[in-house]
């Protein structure tokens, strides 16, 4: 702790200079240590923070055992803050309430009577209205505390004594978990199943060198038992992989994905509704429903029609789908993605090792320290019992002497002024023996029987020999600890109502990401409009006539096409880059839209080449002005960031010029020199990124247009007058050749623009 500096006497004439940096460091260190050691972090041995330990100890002092009657929480809080914990009454009451909540504690330590809050987040009633007593769990934590099982220390005012740690016969740290934020560190431990913890502890006693994997449940060997994973008081489905959980337990850091438990209820005639019966740990039901309702109003859940809370004592949240055709799995996956119906519970096993050193511990280390503590408690209780037996044997020895000399003893007591000293001298008694004889009632003295004394003496002597043998043998001590753990395991077995596992395990379904994303977007028709200068907007509905569209001065239409708000829009630039925008993310049709460069990181020297709706099954041919090109799968050019994805490598003055869908088995290429070359598409390589290969050779100029077609159907083009021309396979013989050829002059009737469409 920091140095206590009292203000010096003498006023301004007696000022002591203090280095500010050193003084701040000293006081902050004192504060940090106080927070870590006496407030925020639990002890690995009993799993309790000081405030919880003091509450349980105070209730024990008040006699609030599981079989006793309840007492007002106001009385408990008063004793705690008055004798042990000099802090605010509300903070102590909040801690007491949490110990009693069956949705906060996997194994409640306090049995509460009255309103102790609920899973909706409502507060408990004031402590003048509620009552409490300890549960069996608290009794186990205290077991042996009156038998010198643990050390005691003075309280804050040195008027009472409090335990530094509880005996902890129950594996409370892992069974009930813990959370807290200290200075520069924090702890977060989820609750576990006591039956499984006892299995792991028993295995660790037999195999002290067991690894974390040895303590975990193995589906291939279910008979061995072990820890499956967290077991939350609110249930839920854990969808974390076993490998990930093992790594978390090995390092002491990680997390667990937990989902709500849900089922589909058939309403007949094809109708159904989804019912959520369990929600993730530490999620407030009222806030969860409020969040889903907000998303519903914001039209972020187009598959959901309504949500109702039909909960009574049990959780029952009803989700009404938009229609009978809605896929329940996709609806739930979208809710898991957007709401706390799926939560990640962190694991950070940062605890006070042996009550002194804060450190992050692995699962086997936590259990090992708890077992070491239980062994120490066993030794201390055994020594305490041994001392009590020795005292009793000494007294019984005195009783036996008194019995054999009963008449003389009575005479000494009646006639001597100092009977104690006389008996010690006459019979060779110890001070304790003489005092015990003198303290006996006359009735008891007359009823002394040698047989009863010798029977008790022999019984205690036998017990003493057993305890001495126990203290002399490490193996016997571990056997005794294992027996105690076995009794706890029976009491909280999975066959019992409290002990049965509540959280189950499942693999997260391989959901269609595209389907989930679309499920979160209201599907509406739009028309995407991009101008020559790169302004983009989305008009509501499908608009065929774009002649009435308004643009800024000097700007005009570059490309427009129909789409849906659920579509992905691919934008290809002259720099060979592809960008992806969601149809629902495009600016509205009012005004001129927004510049593309605000939405994506598009270089200033690049322009929009084309844009279209993404089709993951489609392939494209991309070509540069110089006549290089290749085939790319459309799904390979989807970009997930603002930076886009470089598809075609071009160097100025060369730039990307054409992006054409693959629709056949041959490719027709027309150059600016009005020469056409036709060759099989298989000669063009397929790649995700590159410069490509030469499609057509030119002396001057570059490529003008490309068309992919099926040779069996022939090559078709349209002139400026709208007339359609088709050349069959036989008619194309003179233009057919191999890739990178020069080609021949285009056929008669080919458009003067050098394009396949007028």
Swiss-Prot record:
User: Which InterPro entries does the annotation name?
Assistant: GyrA/parC_rep, Gyrase/topoIV_suA_C, Topo_IIA-like_dom_sf, Topo_IIA_A/C_ab, Topo_IIA_A_a_sf, Topo_IIA_dom_A, TopoIV_A_Gneg, Type_II_DNA_Topoisomerases
The enzyme's E.C. designation: 5.6.2.2
Instruction: Provide an example Pfam family for this protein.
Output: DNA_topoisoIV
Q: Does the keyword Amino-acid biosynthesis apply?
A: no
Q: Where in the cell is it found?
A: Cell membrane
Provide the membrane topology annotation.
Peripheral membrane protein
- Residue numbers marked as site, Interaction with DNA: 49, 85, 87
What SUPFAM superfamilies does the entry give? Answer: GyrA/ParC C-terminal domain-like (SSF101904), Type II DNA topoisomerase (SSF56719)
| Boundaries of every Topo IIA-type catalytic domain copy | 41-513
Q: What class of enzyme is it?
A: isomerase
Tell me, what does this protein do in biology? Topoisomerase IV is essential for chromosome segregation. It relaxes supercoiled DNA. Performs the decatenation events required during the replication of a circular DNA molecule.
Instruction: Say which family it is in.
Output: Belongs to the type II topoisomerase GyrA/ParC subunit family. ParC type 1 subfamily.
Write the protein's name.
DNA topoisomerase 4 subunit A
> Which species expresses this protein natively?
Rhizobium meliloti (strain 1021) (Ensifer meliloti)
């Amino acid at each position: 702790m920091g140095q206590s500096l009292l203000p010096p006497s003498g006023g301004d004439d007696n000022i002591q200079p203090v280095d500010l940096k050193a003084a701040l460091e000293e006081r902050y260190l004192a504060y940090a240590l106080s927070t870590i050691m006496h407030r925020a972090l639990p002890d690995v041995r009993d799993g309790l923070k000081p405030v919880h330990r003091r509450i349980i100890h105070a209730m024990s002092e008040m006699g609030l055992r599981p079989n006793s009657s309840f007492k007002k929480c106001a009385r408990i809080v008063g004793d705690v803050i008055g004798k042990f914990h000099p802090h605010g009454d509300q903070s102590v009451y909040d801690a007491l309430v949490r110990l009693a909540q069956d949705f906060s504690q996997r194994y409640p330590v306090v049995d509460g009577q009255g309103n102790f809050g609920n899973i909706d987040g409502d507060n408990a009633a004031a402590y003048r209205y509620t009552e409490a007593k300890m549960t069996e769990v608290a009794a186990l934590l205290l077991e042996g505390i009156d038998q010198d099982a643990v050390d005691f220390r003075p309280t804050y005012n040195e008027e009472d004594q409090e335990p530094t740690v509880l005996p902890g016969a129950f594996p409370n740290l892992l069974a009930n978990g813990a959370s807290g934020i200290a200075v520069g560190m924090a702890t977060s431990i989820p609750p576990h199943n006591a039956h499984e913890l006892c299995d792991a502890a028993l295995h660790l006693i037999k195999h002290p060198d067991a690894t974390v994997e040895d303590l975990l449940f193995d589906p291939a060997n279910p008979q061995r038992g072990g820890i499956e994973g967290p077991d939350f008081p609110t249930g839920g489905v854990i969808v974390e992989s076993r490998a990930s959980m093992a790594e978390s337990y090995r390092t002491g850091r990680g997390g667990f994905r937990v989902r709500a438990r849900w089922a589909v209820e058939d309403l007949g005639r094809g109708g159904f509704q989804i019912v959520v019966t369990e929600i993730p740990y530490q999620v407030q039901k009222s806030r969860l429903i409020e969040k889903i309702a907000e998303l519903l109003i914001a039209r972020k859940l187009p598959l959901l029609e309504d949500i109702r809370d039909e909960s009574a004592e049990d959780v029952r949240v009803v989700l009404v789908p938009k229609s009978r055709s809605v896929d329940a799995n996709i609806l739930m996956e979208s809710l898991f993605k957007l709401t706390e119906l799926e939560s990640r519970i962190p694991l950070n096993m940062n605890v006070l090792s042996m009550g002194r050193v804060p450190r992050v511990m692995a699962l086997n280390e936590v259990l090992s320290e708890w077992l070491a503590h239980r062994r120490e408690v066993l030794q201390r209780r055994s020594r305490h019992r041994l001392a009590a037996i020795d005292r009793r044997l000494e007294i019984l020895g005195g009783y036996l002497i008194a019995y054999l000399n009963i008449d003389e003893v009575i005479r000494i007591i009646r006639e001597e002024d100092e009977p104690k000293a006389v008996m010690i001298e006459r019979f060779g008694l110890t001070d304790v023996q003489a005092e015990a004889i003198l303290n006996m009632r006359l009735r008891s003295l007359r009823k002394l029987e040698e047989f009863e004394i010798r029977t008790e003496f022999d019984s205690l002597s036998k017990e003493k020999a057993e305890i001495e043998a126990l203290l002399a043998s490490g193996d016997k001590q571990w056997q005794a600890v294992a027996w105690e753990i076995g009794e706890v395991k029976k009491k909280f077995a999975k066959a019992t109502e409290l002990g049965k596992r509540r959280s189950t395990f499942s693999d997260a379904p391989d959901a269609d990401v595209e389907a989930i994303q679309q499920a979160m977007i209201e599907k509406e028709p739009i028309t995407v409009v991009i101008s020559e200068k790169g302004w983009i907007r989305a008009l509501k509905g499908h608009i065929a006539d774009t002649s009435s569209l308004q643009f800024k001065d000097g700007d005009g239409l570059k490309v427009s096409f129909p789409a849906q708000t659920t579509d992905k829009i691919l934008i290809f630039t002259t720099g060979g880059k592809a960008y992806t925008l969601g149809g629902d993310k495009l600016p509205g049709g009012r005004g001129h839209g927004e510049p593309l460069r605000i939405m994506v990181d598009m270089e200033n020297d690049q322009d929009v080449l084309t844009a279209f709706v993404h089709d993951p099954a489609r392939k494209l041919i991309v070509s540069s002005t110089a006549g290089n090109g290749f085939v790319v799968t459309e799904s390979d050019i989807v970009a997930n960031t603002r930076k886009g994805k470089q598809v075609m490598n071009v160097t100025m003055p060369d730039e990307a010029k054409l992006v054409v869908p693959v629709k056949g088995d041959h490719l027709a290429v027309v150059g600016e020199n009005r020469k056409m070359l036709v060759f099989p598409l298989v000669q063009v390589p397929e790649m995700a990124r590159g410069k490509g290969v030469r499609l057509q050779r030119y002396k001057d100029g570059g490529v003008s247009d490309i068309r992919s077609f099926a040779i069996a159907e022939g090559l078709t083009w349209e002139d400026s007058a709208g007339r359609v021309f088709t050349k069959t396979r036989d008619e194309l013989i003179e233009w057919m050749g191999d890739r990178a050829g020069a080609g021949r002059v285009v056929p008669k009737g080919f458009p003067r623009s050098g394009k396949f469409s007028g």
